Structures are given as structure tokens and as C-alpha cells.
């Protein structure tokens, strides 16, 4: 299976939106997605890559470079990773993780964090298989 990984482009927004809504149960619309990506596309801290199969977007990974006291080079926070359901278990998620890890290494970043839903046990197993440890809790409060 020939998968191409590249940075997101404007014509990918609708596909990424669809994959995100399906994977995470969101109900975002194209206007929301366009506003978001237009806001962050020229900001070095944000990076989104898409996976293409036969020129179709079948997955994506988004991250933000954050800083914290005591973490001089900061860390990369994966804020979204999803692959179309029928394309899962074909190595696409692995290629996306490898791409974001290579990007982090190029920037001198030595730590990547991510959050995943408690119910997403398949995702938990995937991240553990890639060397990620689950040694913290994430709390969320919506206003």
C-alpha cells in the first residue's frame, strides 16, 4: 500500500473535517475548520500532516509545540490523530506518528504528549505499541 504523508493543504480541510468528525464524534463544519487552519497555517508552533492513498486523504495528525517551565525546548502535543475506519490497521497511523516524531527531532524537541478518550482502548494499545507511556491523567472542563 503506497501511502504519502505531506503537510495539510487548503483543499484537504473538508476531508480532515470528515475524518475528525467521524473519529471523535464532533460536529464541526467546514467554516470552523477553515477558520482554524487559516489561523494556524503560518504559525510555526502548529503542524498538521495528512496521509494520502490514491490521492485521497485517509488520515491526519495535528500537533502544537508548547512550552513549560523547566522544559527549555518545549514539547510537542499531538492534538489530533485519526485514520478513516476502513483504512485502519494498514500502517497509516504508524506513518503519521513517525512523521510527527521526525518533525519533533528535527526541531530538537525531545518529548511528545497526547490525550485520548478513556473509551478509546484501541487507540491506547496503538500508542503503547509505539512506545508512549500513560503516566498521567487529563482533565477537561467545558464552558
What residue spans do the PLM features occupy?
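A short beta-loop-alpha structural element at the N-terminal edge
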Residues: 2-16
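Helix-loop element at the rim of GNAT/NAT acetyltransferase active sites that forms part
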Residues: 17-31, 69
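Active-site rim helix/loop that mediates acceptor-substrate recognition in acyltransferases
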Residues: 28-48
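Conserved beta-strand in the GNAT
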Residues: 50, 56-65, 82
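A short, internal acetyl-CoA/4′-phosphopantetheine-binding micro-motif in the GNAT/acyltransferase core
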Residues: 81-88
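Conserved acetyl-CoA-binding loop-helix of GNAT-fold acetyltransferases
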Residues: 89-102, 129
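Conserved active-site alpha-helix within GNAT-family acetyltransferase domains
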Residues: 94, 118-136
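Conserved GNAT acetyl-CoA-binding A-motif
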Residues: 97, 104-115
Amino acid at each position: 500500500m503506497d501511502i504519502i504523508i505531506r503537510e495539510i493543504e487548503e483543499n484537504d480541510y473538508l476531508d480532515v473535517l470528515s475524518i475528525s468528525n467521524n473519529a471523535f464524534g464532533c460536529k464541526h463544519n467546514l467554516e470552523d475548520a477553515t477558520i482554524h487552519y487559516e489561523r494556524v497555517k503560518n504559525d510555526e508552533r502548529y503542524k498538521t500532516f495528512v496521509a494520502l492513498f490514491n490521492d485521497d486523504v485517509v488520515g491526519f495528525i495535528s500537533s502544537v509545540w508548547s512550552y513549560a517551565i523547566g522544559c527549555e525546548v518545549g514539547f510537542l502535543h499531538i492534538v489530533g490523530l485519526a485514520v478513516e475506519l476502513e483504512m485502519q490497521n494498514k500502517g497509516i497511523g504508524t506513518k503519521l506518528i513517525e512523521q510527527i516524531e521526525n518533525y519533533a527531532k528535527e526541531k530538537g524537541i525531545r518529548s511528545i504528549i497526547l490525550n485520548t478518550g478513556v473509551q478509546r482502548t484501541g487507540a491506547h494499545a496503538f500508542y503503547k505499541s509505539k512506545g508512549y507511556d500513560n503516566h498521567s491523567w487529563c482533565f477537561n472542563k467545558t464552558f
